[in-house]
């Protein structure tokens, strides 16, 4: 076993911080997320209104 002990950096109130970034992930702003949700809600409402006429 190693003779030197290494200690981990302290974390505040049990929260851990990760600094390495995953560049493969999709980056989206909060405004973009809200816009996407609103578009999906409008699309679903339109499907409920005109969907039965289109799909029978």
Swiss-Prot record:
NCBIfam families: PRK01253.1
Stretches assigned to the Extracellular side: 50-56
Chief location category: membrane
Protein topology in the membrane: Single-pass membrane protein
A biological-process GO annotation: protein transport
Protein's job: Involved in protein export. The function of the beta subunit is unknown, but it may be involved in stabilization of the trimeric complex.
Gene Ontology CC: one annotated term: plasma membrane
InterPro entries: Preprot_translocase_SecG, SecG/Sec61-beta/Sbh
Name the record gives this protein: Preprotein translocase subunit SecG
Pfam families: Sec61_beta
